[in-house]
Amino acid sequence: MARGPKKHLKRVAAPKHWMLDKLTGVFAPRPSTGPHKLRECLPLIIFLRNRLKYALTGDEVKKICMQRFIKIDGKVRTDITYPAGFMDVISIDKTGENFRLIYDTKGRFAVHRITPEEAKYKLCKVRKIFVGTKGIPHLVTHDARTIRYPDPLIKVNDTIQIDLETGKITDFIKFDTGNLCMVTGGANLGRIGVITNRERHPGSFDVVHVKDANGNSFATRLSNIFVIGKGNKPWISLPRGKGIRLTIAEERDKRLAAKQSSG
């Protein structure tokens, strides 16, 4: 009988979006427990070694982290398997680079560089609102932050903008039709569009219909929707492709056009 937490993760069982090949080893880095789920996070080691290529081995990543160069959401993190996740800001002071973890249209975390101005805040989805001891209202976000005394107008599924220096709420966006959103789970992972309507299904999952900038419509569960802007204006910079998923034929045409223009 297994006692205690699992300490290993086999490479074959690791999430597909980490893009680890099967044959280089047996194990993958098992993310530490933290603000994001194992299947929805990107451990620091994979970001630094496999994405940015700043290190060749896990030992080198450890040496980088132990010099306290890497900050996530403004806090120094020395754990190489720390689970960074959606909307997290990763800052490397030594190189002056800032990244925000955002999905591309294929559902992987893109290496998305942002300005130092944008690195000062992040957006969080409100997961839960409750009244704690002595009647103090609390709010819990998707990255496990608990904030006391929030604005009473903020409800579940809204998005709040958090100042990373202070951890305070600076602004919020209501979950409403006509607002820009990103899909953070399911088959449409990484797509961005405007919410057109919400079907309520009591006792089951509410379905949200979304329309992207090209006019394609798709539907997903409410739990997968993350509002990122008011109207058509996103509050964060978006990665290449702007969250519009192309069909296979469109991708092929785009590739051929790029090839011809360069060739």
Curated annotation (Swiss-Prot):
Q: What keywords are assigned to this protein? A: Acetylation, Cytoplasm, Isopeptide bond, Nucleus, Ribonucleoprotein, Ribosomal protein, RNA-binding, rRNA-binding, Ubl conjugation
Modification type N6-acetyllysine: residues: 233
Q: Which PROSITE patterns match?
A: RIBOSOMAL_S4E, S4
**Keyword field contains Signal:** no
Tell me a GO biological process for this protein: cytoplasmic translation
Q: Name one Pfam family in it.
A: Ribosomal_S4e
| GO molecular-function terms, A-Z | RNA binding; rRNA binding; structural constituent of ribosome
Q: Where in the cell is it found?
A: Cytoplasm; Nucleus, Nucleolus
Every copy of the S4 RNA-binding domain together lies at 42-104
Where does this chain mainly localize? cytoplasm
Q: Where is this cross-link: Glycyl lysine isopeptide (Lys-Gly) (interchain with G-Cter in SUMO2)?
A: 230
* Coiled-coil features, chain-numbered ranges: none
| A Gene Ontology cellular-component term | ribonucleoprotein complex
What InterPro entries does the record tag this protein with?
KOW, Rib_uL2_dom2, Ribosomal_eS4, Ribosomal_eS4_C, Ribosomal_eS4_central_region, Ribosomal_eS4_central_sf, Ribosomal_eS4_KOW, Ribosomal_eS4_N
**What the protein does?**
Component of the small ribosomal subunit. The ribosome is a large ribonucleoprotein complex responsible for the synthesis of proteins in the cell. Part of the small subunit (SSU) processome, first precursor of the small eukaryotic ribosomal subunit. During the assembly of the SSU processome in the nucleolus, many ribosome biogenesis factors, an RNA chaperone and ribosomal proteins associate with the nascent pre-rRNA and work in concert to generate RNA folding, modifications, rearrangements and cleavage as well as targeted degradation of pre-ribosomal RNA by the RNA exosome.
Q: Which family does it belong to?
A: Belongs to the eukaryotic ribosomal protein eS4 family.
Q: How does it assemble?
A: Component of the small ribosomal subunit. Part of the small subunit (SSU) processome, composed of more than 70 proteins and the RNA chaperone small nucleolar RNA (snoRNA) U3. Identified in a IGF2BP1-dependent mRNP granule complex containing untranslated mRNAs.
- Matching HAMAP family, A to Z? Ribosomal_eS4 (MF_00485)
Protein's name in the database: Small ribosomal subunit protein eS4, X isoform
Task: Give the organism the record lists.
Answer: Homo sapiens (Human)
